[in-house]
């Protein structure tokens, strides 16, 4: 295949990928926002339920102390029932994972939310736990996973196009992938911080605890944050400053 043919095929594949991405638009059932997503709400829920057992196994299973699991459930359900999340189509379930070494919390599409014992054991208050769970609920409500899947499909299409058209596909493919996905991660974390604070306030928790959570996470990472521009997540210090602004915003609305 000569160079001109490769370029033409690459352009066609890229155009198909871009057009397909921009045609995947749906209205968020909670926020009303128009979003580019690949999954319906029902598909999000099904994917989350299907993937949950694998995630549980990956982090050492469920934590055996049922009282601690009940504590996580109580805080999570209070957040859901006190906010718009309770009237959303998502069925939230909260999982305490047995992993005592990995400090982590995350959400799968459709309402499956996880926190490791390693993270829970570092928290000093119910308000801090509410901050973490509220943040993860924010990811679900804003359909970040569904948006991410749509962007991955776009990225894969562009990668295929550059692989065909470029003489150095590896470098260009990685560049395309990084540029498409970098802003997505940064924006979503800040948006979920915002929603986490809002849900904390609505459920009667102290939103300042989110700042304490950021400091705990920073300490757990050894303070070794990557330079913010090259990270998919804002730095802990940047998030703390943004959180102060968000907390002030929602306190004014009380």
State what each model feature region is.
Residues 1-254:
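A Zn2+-metalloprotease active-site environment signal
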């Amino acid at each position: 295949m000569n160079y001109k043919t490769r370029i033409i095929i690459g352009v066609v594949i890229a155009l198909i990928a871009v057009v397909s991405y921009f045609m995947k638009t749906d209205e968020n059932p909670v926020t009303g926002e128009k979003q580019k997503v690949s999954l319906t709400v029902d598909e999000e829920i099904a994917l989350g339920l299907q993937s949950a057992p694998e995630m549980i196994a990956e982090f050492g299973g469920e934590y055996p102390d049922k009282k601690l699991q009940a504590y996580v459930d109580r805080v999570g359900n209070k957040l859901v029932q006190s906010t718009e999340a309770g009237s959303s189509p998502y069925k939230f379930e909260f999982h305490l994972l047995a992993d005592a070494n990995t400090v982590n919390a995350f959400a799968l599409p459709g309402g499956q939310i996880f926190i490791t014992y390693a993270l829970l054991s570092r928290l000093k208050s119910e308000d801090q736990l509410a901050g973490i769970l509220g943040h993860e609920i924010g990811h679900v409500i804003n359909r970040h996973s569904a948006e991410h899947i749509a962007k991955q499909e776009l990225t894969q299409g562009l990668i295929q196009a550059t692989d065909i058209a470029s003489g150095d596909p590896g470098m260009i493919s990685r560049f395309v992938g990084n540029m498409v996905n970098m802003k997505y991660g940064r924006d979503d974390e800040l948006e979920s911080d915002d929603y986490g604070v809002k849900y904390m306030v609505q459920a009667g928790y102290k939103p300042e605890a989110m700042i304490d959570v950021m400091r705990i996470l920073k300490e757990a990472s050894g303070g070794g944050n990557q330079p913010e521009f090259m990270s998919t997540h804002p730095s802990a210090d940047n998030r703390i400053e943004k959180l102060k602004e968000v907390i002030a915003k929602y306190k004014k609305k009380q």
